[in-house]
């Protein structure tokens, strides 16, 4: 279908699913594999109502995702003990392989199931199979970025702290309270607040050298807050557990599709996009600069793109077949 460029992925997905349901003879033999834009109550409700199977990524904004990951770590605190579902080579030849480990759990999702005779959709909390997957690659990415996050938070606090230090507080309680909101915003550190007491010598009312025997200038007491930062190891460990995992949701039962197959089908998205040319087609260089103004022209261009991709894929298929038959690649 033809949608506005501002149409959300959720709305577009629902339209595509409705069209697929009319085209495919037996939806029960179809598994829709998609990213997290597929996972919302109405879209999953339509999938279930149409009889499609699905595998998708649970968005980070869903509370059930965090709960499932916490449950997985609670049952097996060391990821090495999680079953290996898939592996891929490391970034360099000398690097060890990167593993995907995980297992299935039960989660509940709020669905909007279709009703008969165009009646309002029925809200229902349905149990779903959720596969919690630990990725060595994601864990490594978190570890690599951690020091930068710690440094940025420290620098941000120091910058804000300078503004607090420019103020003078009449009592220790006020000085400590001024640092409270800053410390509460810390994500990667814990802050220990202390208060220093200082005596400030006031300026004399008259300029010049004071006369002999003049009383000393008056002083006043001010309080200055200080904060000492330490890494919050508990917060870092909790963030590492969440960042190193992702959660897939599917309606396939474990005795029908193993955890290995669910993960493999989801990972095949990248293969489909990369080998068919859709990744290039989705890029801004291919689509964004084209302004055709009318729906008819847009449909025509879409048809031309589809024919071009078919020709491209046929050439790629023929070339790969020839390379395999000859047992050698193509020299660049």
Task: Enumerate the predicted regions with their spans.
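Anion-binding and metal-coordination hotspots
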Residues: 1-332
């Amino acid at each position: 279908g033809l949608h506005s460029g501002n149409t959300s992925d959720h709305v577009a997905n629902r339209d595509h699913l409705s069209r697929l349901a009319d085209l495919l003879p037996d939806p029960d033999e179809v598994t829709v594999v998609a990213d997290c834009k597929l996972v919302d109550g109405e879209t999953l409700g339509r999938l279930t109502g149409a009889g499609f199977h699905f595998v998708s990524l649970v968005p980070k904004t869903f509370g059930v995702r965090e709960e499932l990951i916490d449950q997985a770590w609670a049952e097996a605190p060391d990821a090495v003990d999680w079953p290996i579902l898939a592996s891929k080579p490391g970034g360099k030849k000398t690097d060890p392989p990167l593993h995907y480990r995980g297992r299935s759990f039960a989660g509940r999702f709020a669905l909007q199931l279709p009703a008969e005779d165009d009646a309002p959709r029925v809200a229902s909390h349905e149990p779903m199979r959720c596969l919690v997957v630990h990725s060595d690659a994601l864990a490594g990415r978190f570890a690599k970025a951690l020091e930068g996050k710690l440094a940025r938070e420290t620098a941000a606090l120091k910058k804000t702290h300078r503004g607090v230090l420019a103020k003078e507080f009449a009592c220790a309680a006020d000085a400590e309270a001024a640092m409270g909101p800053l410390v509460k915003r810390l994500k990667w550190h814990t802050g220990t607040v202390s208060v220093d007491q200082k005596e400030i010598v006031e300026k004399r009312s008259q300029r010049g050298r004071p006369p002999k025997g003049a009383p000393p200038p008056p002083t006043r007491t001010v309080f200055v807050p200080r904060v000492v930062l330490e890494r919050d190891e508990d917060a870092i460990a909790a963030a590492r557990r969440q960042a190193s995992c992702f959660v897939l949701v599917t309606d396939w039962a474990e005795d029908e599709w193993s955890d290995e197959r669910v993960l493999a089908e989801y990972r095949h998205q990248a293969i489909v996009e990369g080998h068919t040319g859709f990744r290039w087609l989705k890029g801004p260089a291919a689509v964004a600069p084209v302004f055709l103004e009318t729906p008819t022209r847009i449909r025509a261009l879409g048809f031309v793109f589809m024919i071009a991709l078919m020709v491209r894929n046929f050439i790629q298929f023929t070339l790969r077949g020839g390379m395999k038959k000859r047992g050698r690649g193509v020299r660049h």
